[in-house]
Amino acid sequence: MGIFSRFFGKKSESKQIGNSIIANPDIDSPVGLTIVFKGALDINNDKLLTQLKSIDPTIKDIRYEMPFGQLEEGICLLVSWGKHVIRIYGLNAPYPKDVLELCVTPANYGQEIKQQIYESDSHLLLYYVGYEQDVLEQYLALTHLAACFEQFNALAVINEDAHTSLPVNFINALASENDGLTTLVACLPLLFCGFVKYEIENIKGIWMRTYGANKFGLPNFAALANSYEESEYYFDIFSNILNYLRQSQAIMNPGDTMEMGDNRMMSLRAPQDDEYFLKDQGDLLIIEINN
């Protein structure tokens, strides 16, 4: 078995041949998370697996493989359990500053930890290359593993596709609770579909929107709020709609309307030409609520 096939997969092969871990060759655009660290990477693989077993005692077959052996600089690792295979790249270099600003600045946690993240020294890239088909389950597998890196001076978990991040100690606390990660399932904009607020020059109000829903095959949503005080209101609306669409496999289109109670009606529309700042990968629907 060649190194390339073991790390990147081969069409004719299944998950494992002999004792080798095989990445799924049918995943072209894997979901991923990034972990940033204080100081140089100093990962003990055995302790990593022990922590994962501690978080989820039902895991019985967890194992890892270093396809390129022990590297002088950085990390190259495959971790496997059940249907899951996660590919890890590690670099003793700061994560790009522009991506950190994109994902950390709008996140809803304290400035002190944000400053530590901006000053981080190294990072890991985690990609899901296993055999679970459900994108949410792929994200949960990544999150379970990401939580285990707190012991190695990890600071935060970054989701670049979702333009958001969370402190790793918060994620580890959730993962260590019974069904704690269901919080991230119920509130997709916390980590898997980011919730971003920003002001646009010459536009009255605050734009609020999601990022990353396209990874689930869903549209992103946006709304023009009156003020930042409506953040929780729109966060809940986005969460509820995304969960409804994911669970029901329903489809929403521009022009659709929905009753919301209290004599309010929600309508959906596509971005207009002068709302170019809302356009990116995948579809986006703008929510308008009328009394």
Residue spans for each PLM region:
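Short acidic, S/G/P-rich loop/turn micro-motifs used as interaction or catalytic elements
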Residues: A40-I43, Y131-D134, Y228-S231
